[in-house]
Each structure stands twice: as C-alpha cells, then as structure tokens.
C-alpha cells in the first residue's frame, strides 16, 4: 500500500532523527517516536533522548501562485519535535548546554536534505521553547518547530509535484 506524500515526509523526519547517534559523531543518541493516538503520549517510554514527533494540521501556502499551474496544491506542514533532555542531580554540565546540543544536532541533521528525500520543496526551521514538567522535575527538554513545504496534485495527495 502506498503512502501519501505527507506521510513519506514524516517518515523521513523520524528516520533522520533516529540516525543521530554518538557512534556516528553526534553529541547524543536520539530516538524518534510518533504517538499512536492523538492527545495521548502516556504510553510512550519517556527517556533521555526521546524525540516525540507531533504532526500538526497543515496550512495552505501561496506557493501555487509561483507555478502558475492549476491542478496543484501546496501545503505547509508544521511539526513539533518534543525532545526529552535531563541529567542526574550530580551532573556539572549546564542543562542549557545539553538542550543546545540536542537542538543543534536535530537542526543540522534535518537540513542535510531540505527536500525530505525529494518529497518536499523545502524544510524551514522555526523557533524553539524549553520546557519543564512541573509534576516531574527531571522531565525537561525543548520543543523545536519545523515546517515542511510540499506540493501535490490537487486530486492526488499521493503524487508529489515539486
């Protein structure tokens, strides 16, 4: 069974984040997961280096006008990458340093191929925000926003048209 272009893009993001490993020269090992149900991350194994890939609702873009072509539809697909980062109480490295390394590794890896395997027009880096779970002082991290712009045929979301 084939997948729509947006699913291929999402799978590429997960694969790229999963490829961030110390053995390959990165600062840490990251493990990307996608929730199996909307609004329920409760069953995810919360661990240091976990990156939860949240696919948000897409927006229309004006990229269709650039092509002057009818029959195409351009989308801006936002993703929130929720990265868990924590350390032991006796650690001496500032938590900001660890968070900065996670963010930089993810941004660098995702920008190696802005086209998400040829399925997208471009990948745009957005802002980020650090977080702490008030109920669990050890649960800290950063949320990174990216947006992937892609184009498909108006009548066929399985066919890319870049």
Task: Annotate the PLM regions.
Residues 1, 5, 94, 134:
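Conserved aromatic-histidine-acidic binding/catalytic patches
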Residues 1-68, 118, 157-162:
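Small/polar-rich, solvent-exposed N-terminal microdomains that initiate assembly or binding
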Residues 8, 70-76, 84-108:
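Extracellular/virion structural assembly segments
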Residues 19-28, 46-55, 96-154:
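Acidic-leaning, charged glycine-interspersed low-complexity segments
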Residues 54-59, 79-87, 110:
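Generic secondary-structure microfeatures
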Residues 62-64, 89-95, 155:
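Short, solvent-exposed secondary-structure capping/transition elements
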Residues 68-70, 135:
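Residues embedded in well-ordered secondary-structure elements
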Residues 71-88, 139-152:
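Oligomerization/assembly interface segments of phage tail-like spikes and tubes
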